[in-house]
Swiss-Prot record:
Active-site residues annotated for this sequence: C93
Gene3D superfamilies: Ubiquitin Conjugating Enzyme (3.10.110.10)
Protein name, UniProt field: SUMO-conjugating enzyme ubc9
Function: Catalyzes the covalent attachment of ubiquitin-like protein SUMO/Smt3 to other proteins. Required for efficient recovery from DNA damage or S-phase arrest and normal mitosis. This may be as part of a checkpoint independent recovery process.
EC number: 2.3.2.-
Lineage per the UniProt record: Eukaryota, Fungi, Dikarya, Ascomycota, Taphrinomycotina
Encoding gene (name): hus5
A matching Pfam family: UQ_con
GO molecular function, one term: ATP binding
Pathway: Protein modification; protein sumoylation
GO cellular component: cytosol; heterochromatin; nucleus
PANTHER family (UniProt xref): UBIQUITIN-CONJUGATING ENZYME E2 (PTHR24067)
Family, as annotated: Belongs to the ubiquitin-conjugating enzyme family.
Length: 157
Protein backbone atom coordinates (compact mmCIF):
# COMPACT_ATOMS: atom_id res chain seq x y z
CA UNK A 1 0.00 0.00 0.00
CA UNK A 2 1.27 3.49 -0.79
CA UNK A 3 2.56 5.56 2.10
CA UNK A 4 -0.14 8.20 1.45
CA UNK A 5 -2.86 5.54 1.60
CA UNK A 6 -1.42 3.94 4.76
CA UNK A 7 -0.93 7.28 6.54
CA UNK A 8 -4.45 8.42 5.69
CA UNK A 9 -6.08 5.16 6.82
CA UNK A 10 -4.10 5.15 10.08
CA UNK A 11 -5.23 8.73 10.71
CA UNK A 12 -8.85 7.86 9.82
CA UNK A 13 -8.75 4.97 12.30
CA UNK A 14 -7.35 7.20 15.04
CA UNK A 15 -10.01 9.87 14.39
CA UNK A 16 -12.79 7.27 14.33
CA UNK A 17 -11.71 5.79 17.64
CA UNK A 18 -11.64 9.27 19.15
CA UNK A 19 -15.01 10.41 17.81
CA UNK A 20 -17.64 8.45 15.91
CA UNK A 21 -21.43 8.66 15.66
CA UNK A 22 -23.46 6.71 18.22
CA UNK A 23 -24.38 3.16 17.18
CA UNK A 24 -21.87 2.95 14.31
CA UNK A 25 -18.75 0.82 14.21
CA UNK A 26 -15.85 0.75 11.75
CA UNK A 27 -12.68 -1.27 12.14
CA UNK A 28 -9.99 -2.74 9.93
CA UNK A 29 -10.25 -6.49 9.30
CA UNK A 30 -7.58 -8.86 10.58
CA UNK A 31 -5.01 -9.97 8.02
CA UNK A 32 -3.92 -13.60 7.65
CA UNK A 33 -0.86 -12.93 9.84
CA UNK A 34 -3.07 -11.60 12.65
CA UNK A 35 -2.24 -7.92 12.06
CA UNK A 36 -4.60 -5.22 10.86
CA UNK A 37 -5.63 -5.04 7.21
CA UNK A 38 -6.14 -1.30 6.78
CA UNK A 39 -7.33 -1.83 3.18
CA UNK A 40 -10.48 -3.72 4.26
CA UNK A 41 -12.83 -2.63 7.03
CA UNK A 42 -15.93 -4.11 8.67
CA UNK A 43 -18.56 -1.49 9.30
CA UNK A 44 -21.99 -1.24 10.92
CA UNK A 45 -24.52 1.51 10.24
CA UNK A 46 -27.61 1.83 12.45
CA UNK A 47 -30.97 2.72 10.93
CA UNK A 48 -32.00 6.28 11.76
CA UNK A 49 -34.46 6.72 14.63
CA UNK A 50 -38.08 7.38 13.62
CA UNK A 51 -37.61 5.76 10.19
CA UNK A 52 -38.57 2.32 8.86
CA UNK A 53 -34.84 1.45 9.08
CA UNK A 54 -34.74 1.99 12.86
CA UNK A 55 -33.71 -1.04 14.89
CA UNK A 56 -31.43 -2.50 12.24
CA UNK A 57 -27.64 -2.50 12.29
CA UNK A 58 -26.58 -2.85 8.67
CA UNK A 59 -23.22 -4.49 8.00
CA UNK A 60 -20.91 -3.34 5.23
CA UNK A 61 -17.43 -3.97 4.00
CA UNK A 62 -15.27 -1.08 2.86
CA UNK A 63 -12.49 -1.98 0.42
CA UNK A 64 -9.95 0.78 -0.07
CA UNK A 65 -8.00 0.90 -3.35
CA UNK A 66 -4.22 1.43 -3.39
CA UNK A 67 -4.93 4.92 -4.76
CA UNK A 68 -7.01 5.98 -1.72
CA UNK A 69 -7.72 8.83 -0.97
CA UNK A 70 -7.46 9.83 -4.64
CA UNK A 71 -10.01 7.10 -5.42
CA UNK A 72 -12.98 6.22 -3.17
CA UNK A 73 -13.51 2.95 -1.30
CA UNK A 74 -16.03 0.37 -2.51
CA UNK A 75 -18.80 -0.08 0.06
CA UNK A 76 -20.91 -3.26 0.04
CA UNK A 77 -23.72 -4.35 2.31
CA UNK A 78 -23.28 -7.93 3.51
CA UNK A 79 -25.80 -9.39 3.01
CA UNK A 80 -27.12 -7.12 0.22
CA UNK A 81 -30.01 -4.87 1.24
CA UNK A 82 -33.37 -4.33 -0.41
CA UNK A 83 -32.93 -0.67 -1.40
CA UNK A 84 -33.22 1.34 -4.64
CA UNK A 85 -29.56 2.45 -4.45
CA UNK A 86 -27.97 -0.88 -3.53
CA UNK A 87 -26.95 -3.18 -6.37
CA UNK A 88 -27.92 -6.87 -6.07
CA UNK A 89 -24.24 -7.50 -5.20
CA UNK A 90 -24.63 -5.24 -2.15
CA UNK A 91 -22.53 -2.40 -3.60
CA UNK A 92 -23.79 1.05 -2.59
CA UNK A 93 -24.63 3.53 -5.37
CA UNK A 94 -23.92 6.96 -3.87
CA UNK A 95 -22.46 10.03 -5.62
CA UNK A 96 -19.74 10.61 -3.00
CA UNK A 97 -18.46 7.06 -3.67
CA UNK A 98 -18.15 7.71 -7.40
CA UNK A 99 -14.93 9.21 -8.77
CA UNK A 100 -16.75 10.84 -11.68
CA UNK A 101 -19.43 12.38 -9.47
CA UNK A 102 -19.05 13.56 -5.89
CA UNK A 103 -15.85 11.93 -4.57
CA UNK A 104 -13.25 14.25 -3.07
CA UNK A 105 -10.09 13.03 -1.28
CA UNK A 106 -11.05 15.10 1.79
CA UNK A 107 -14.19 12.99 2.42
CA UNK A 108 -13.74 10.96 5.61
CA UNK A 109 -14.94 7.49 6.57
CA UNK A 110 -17.30 9.16 9.05
CA UNK A 111 -18.82 11.32 6.27
CA UNK A 112 -19.20 8.28 3.99
CA UNK A 113 -21.02 6.26 6.66
CA UNK A 114 -23.31 9.15 7.62
CA UNK A 115 -24.05 9.65 3.91
CA UNK A 116 -24.98 5.99 3.53
CA UNK A 117 -27.19 6.19 6.63
CA UNK A 118 -29.01 9.20 5.12
CA UNK A 119 -29.38 7.36 1.81
CA UNK A 120 -31.18 4.43 3.49
CA UNK A 121 -34.27 6.48 4.31
CA UNK A 122 -33.89 8.99 1.49
CA UNK A 123 -33.10 7.06 -1.72
CA UNK A 124 -31.83 8.84 -4.81
CA UNK A 125 -34.52 7.86 -7.32
CA UNK A 126 -32.51 9.42 -10.17
CA UNK A 127 -29.84 6.73 -9.74
CA UNK A 128 -31.55 3.33 -9.28
CA UNK A 129 -29.36 0.26 -8.80
CA UNK A 130 -31.98 -2.39 -7.94
CA UNK A 131 -35.08 -2.77 -10.11
CA UNK A 132 -37.43 -4.45 -7.61
CA UNK A 133 -36.74 -2.01 -4.76
CA UNK A 134 -36.89 1.00 -7.11
CA UNK A 135 -40.22 -0.10 -8.64
CA UNK A 136 -41.80 -0.86 -5.26
CA UNK A 137 -40.56 2.46 -3.81
CA UNK A 138 -42.17 4.34 -6.73
CA UNK A 139 -45.43 2.35 -7.06
CA UNK A 140 -46.26 0.85 -3.64
CA UNK A 141 -44.72 2.85 -0.80
CA UNK A 142 -46.73 0.97 1.86
CA UNK A 143 -45.39 -2.41 0.74
CA UNK A 144 -41.89 -0.94 0.39
CA UNK A 145 -41.96 0.37 3.99
CA UNK A 146 -43.26 -3.01 5.21
CA UNK A 147 -40.36 -4.77 3.48
CA UNK A 148 -37.85 -2.30 4.97
CA UNK A 149 -39.23 -2.81 8.50
CA UNK A 150 -38.93 -6.59 8.08
CA UNK A 151 -35.35 -6.09 6.91
CA UNK A 152 -34.67 -3.93 10.00
CA UNK A 153 -35.89 -6.78 12.22
CA UNK A 154 -33.67 -9.26 10.34
CA UNK A 155 -30.68 -6.97 10.89
CA UNK A 156 -31.28 -6.22 14.56
CA UNK A 157 -28.01 -6.26 16.53
Amino acid sequence: MSSLCKTRLQEERKQWRRDHPFGFYAKPCKSSDGGLDLMNWKVGIPGKPKTSWEGGLYKLTMAFPEEYPTRPPKCRFTPPLFHPNVYPSGTVCLSILNEEEGWKPAITIKQILLGIQDLLDDPNIASPAQTEAYTMFKKDKVEYEKRVRAQARENAP
